[in-house]
Regions:
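Helix-to-loop junction immediately C-terminal to a conserved catalytic motif
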Residues: 49
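Conserved ABC transporter NBD signature motif
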Residues: 57-70
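Conserved ABC ATPase "signature" region
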Residues: 108-123
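Conserved ABC ATPase signature
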Residues: 127-131, 135
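H-loop/switch region of ABC-family ATPase nucleotide-binding domains
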Residues: 187-188
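H-loop (His-switch) and adjacent beta-strand-loop-beta switch element
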Residues: 199-212
Length: 231
């Protein structure tokens, strides 16, 4: 499923958080949305998911204007890990099952199948507070996968986890891409993980660069985005 963002602006807290952002993603693609903290990455993902109103511009899915109903049917947003109360006394299976309540419609993926897909089948009965950071991120991804969505919006899924966990998560995302899903993944990491993506969008309130990881590195050179050196 294709996703088209055209000249989108979003206001947050009375200020314009992002402005004039345009790009188009095709089905079966894995795209990184990279920028420093405060660049508007989460704001853009939430706007695409229909959780924030647009100040300007438009969003389309497969050529159809995005409505809240369409967003709920075809989009799934994975929140940042810090937004979840991991001390809450429920199991991994129960957390993932909550994704079916968010979707609230037929066609949801089986919880056990989603857990197996992210490599957490053996941990289904484990309590949330017993998970490592990487396991928490995979549990959130599984919760996203039980929703019948064709476009996945993942907010900082690789943040604050160790390299082996990041590698495992990137492998899962690659498998989802290969299965035909469209993934847009936010990150503030300019490291070698970018090479796992088909395409990179660099955002700092506006879109600064768009291309393959190699093209973006060449285009930006030594440019600083926020406090990060891109070269």
């Amino acid at each position: 499923m294709s996703l088209a963002v055209e000249q989108v602006g979003v206001r947050r807290g009375g200020e314009l958080a992002i402005e004039a952002v345009s790009f188009e993603l095709q089905g079966g693609s894995l795209t990184a949305l990279v920028g420093p903290n405060g660049a508007g990455k989460s704001t853009l993902l939430q706007a695409i998911a229909g959780q924030l109103p647009l100040e300007s511009g438009s969003i389309q899915l497969d050529g159809r204007p995005l409505t809240l109903t369409l967003a709920r049917r075809q989009l799934a947003l994975m929140p940042q890990r810090g937004e979840i109360a991991w001390a809450f006394p429920i199991t991994v299976r129960e957390l993932v099952g909550l994704g079916r309540l968010v979707a609230a419609r037929p066609g949801c993926c089986d919880v056990e199948a989603a857990l197996q897909r992210v490599g957490l089948g053996a941990l289904a009965k484990r309590r949330l507070d017993q998970l490592s950071g990487g396991q928490q991120q995979r549990a959130l991804l599984a919760r996203t996968l039980v929703q019948p969505a064709q476009v996945l919006l993942l907010d900082e899924p690789c943040a604050a986890i160790d390299p082996p966990a990041r590698t495992a998560l990137l492998q899962v995302m690659g498998q989802l891409r290969d299965a035909g899903l469209t993934l847009l993944v936010s990150s503030h990491d300019w490291g070698h993980d970018l090479d796992a993506y088909d395409r990179v969008l660099v955002l700092d309130r506006q879109l600064l660069a768009d291309g393959t990881p190699q093209q973006v590195r060449r285009a930006l050179g030594d440019l600083r985005v926020g406090n990060h050196r891109c070269g």
